[in-house]
Amino acid sequence: MPEIRVTPLGAGQDVGRSCILVSIAGKNVMLDCGMHMGFNDDRRFPDFSYITQNGRLTDFLDCVIISHFHLDHCGALPYFSEMVGYDGPIYMTHPTQAICPILLEDYRKIAVDKKGEANFFTSQMIKDCMKKVVAVHLHQTVQVDDELEIKAYYAGHVLGAAMFQIKVGSESVVYTGDYNMTPDRHLGAAWIDKCRPNLLITESTYATTIRDSKRCRERDFLKKVHETVERGGKVLIPVFALGRAQELCILLETFWERMNLKVPIYFSTGLTEKANHYYKLFIPWTNQKIRKTFVQRNMFEFKHIKAFDRAFADNPGPMVVFATPGMLHAGQSLQIFRKWAGNEKNMVIMPGYCVQGTVGHKILSGQRKLEMEGRQVLEVKMQVEYMSFSAHADAKGIMQLVGQAEPESVLLVHGEAKKMEFLKQKIEQELRVNCYMPANGETVTLPTSPSIPVGISLGLLKREMAQGLLPEAKKPRLLHGTLIMKDSNFRLVSSEQALKELGLAEHQLRFTCRVHLHDTRKEQETALRVYSHLKSVLKDHCVQHLPDGSVTVESVLLQAAAPSEDPGTKVLLVSWTYQDEELGSFLTSLLKKGLPQAPS
């Protein structure tokens, strides 16, 4: 029995180091290769020993797919390919290919050059890793080999994020990565067709959350920022370089312009320029409004937002600073936080999810005394606000995507166990779909029913539609046609088209049944009695008496004959084509009951 096996190496009942191993019809695919921001030891990387105990990883894995450039999805890639050892293809979209190495190098500098961490990848390893990348376009079907194919769908979330369909023959798995089902100020909503995979592997970060109105959240965010700078405080907004950063920059830029505010807004040095460059380069990945107005005005060229210099953090007076990274686990955002945390006038606004172990997660959990490096205790007096501008789907969005794709089963990753359990029950009860939520290292095995895909000719479909017999997804029905196999592909076509394509002449096949009648009259008289009887019974059918004495009802032919062994009885031969099988069977049953008594 064919089966699909799924083992999370990371992000199983957890958020961070996303890495899922999928085996489908003898092919092995690794989905994402992320890093956990809450750890500084070997636990930051997925446990690759689950992949295979014997031989090279390249011999076992057919390919690696990266959904987007966030480090919890791609951060372990150079470690995996260059230090663990993998030489096979790595698939990702063009924007991910462009941005991924920049973020990897930024993080490497923080981890190695500033913190002095060992057993970490080098700049050269990042370059060597990226040489193995094969970039894909949206909706492009890519043949990994003769049997395995992949296809990318738009995921929203961040520039270049994609959901991937992995297909081998008639079996398929869809992996969502991170996605957003609602459009925002710079990206569109995630979209996938009704692909009906055997399994949908979906993120579940906000498995129990139904978000409030986006407009209310934006108004609340602007109000809090404005109130803080009005009283002379500083606002720190930790963000990742691309994604929510651009969303909130557009929002503040518009507000500052409208209110004619002069308080400075800063963004981490260098990242605005890089972001601007990539949004220009990959403008087709943005939403419709930005694509339309891009020629007249680039929404990412900000008038009020300037590059940040480290010395600005000590400047007196109010300011707003966007600093990376978004979870306060390292880098410039953490440095600024340490400087500003002791002043109650200041505010830190966390606009996205923070994994356990990060400073961001600790302050959102209510901790106000933090043990930093060197056992130094930092007292947090500044105001802490969490405002979800996260580009992840909420519970409603996840249910919407499951309904859209119509999978046979669902598997939840990238979420917290308790929240996953709630969503699992919701999916099973409301959508009647089996749902799984394996922990890291746990394997889920799903049996699949072998099926053969059959293409249907346009002519046959048009004929069915003209008869008002279009099949429905929920109520399947039979289509009659001729099955043709060519180059291992099956097609259902009309019999006329099949004869034409195969160069064959039509031969009519008829079925004949003998019905015995007790009648001593001549054959012609018997046939006339049969005609009169059927004419009176079958008022909605075309019943004819032909010159040769035979009777027809539609395509059914009836002929009376005297059997040689008993001239006193007659045999009625009833013959029909397979199209009129129901009518032929009905007439046979009717005539077996006998003819009405003739008047004397």
Curated annotation (Swiss-Prot):
Binding-site positions, Zn(2+) 2: D72, H73, D178, H414
Binding positions (Zn(2+) 1): H68, H70, H157, D178
Pfam families in the record: Beta-Casp, IntS11_C, Lactamase_B_6, RMMBL
A biological process term (GO) from this entry: RNA polymerase II transcription initiation surveillance
CC cofactor: Zn(2+)
Family matches, as SUPFAM superfamilies: Metallo-hydrolase/oxidoreductase (SSF56281)
Annotated EC: 3.1.27.-
Keywords: Cytoplasm, Hydrolase, Intellectual disability, Isopeptide bond, Metal-binding, Nucleus, Ubl conjugation, Zinc
Ubl conjugation recorded as keyword: yes
Compartment(s) of residence: Nucleus; Cytoplasm
CDD domains per UniProt: INTS11-like_MBL-fold (cd16291)
PANTHER family found in the cross-reference section: CLEAVAGE AND POLYADENYLATION SPECIFICITY FACTOR FAMILY MEMBER (PTHR11203), INTEGRATOR COMPLEX SUBUNIT 11 (PTHR11203:SF37)
Name under which the protein is recorded: Integrator complex subunit 11
Lineage of origin: Eukaryota, Metazoa, Chordata, Craniata, Vertebrata
Underlying gene: INTS11
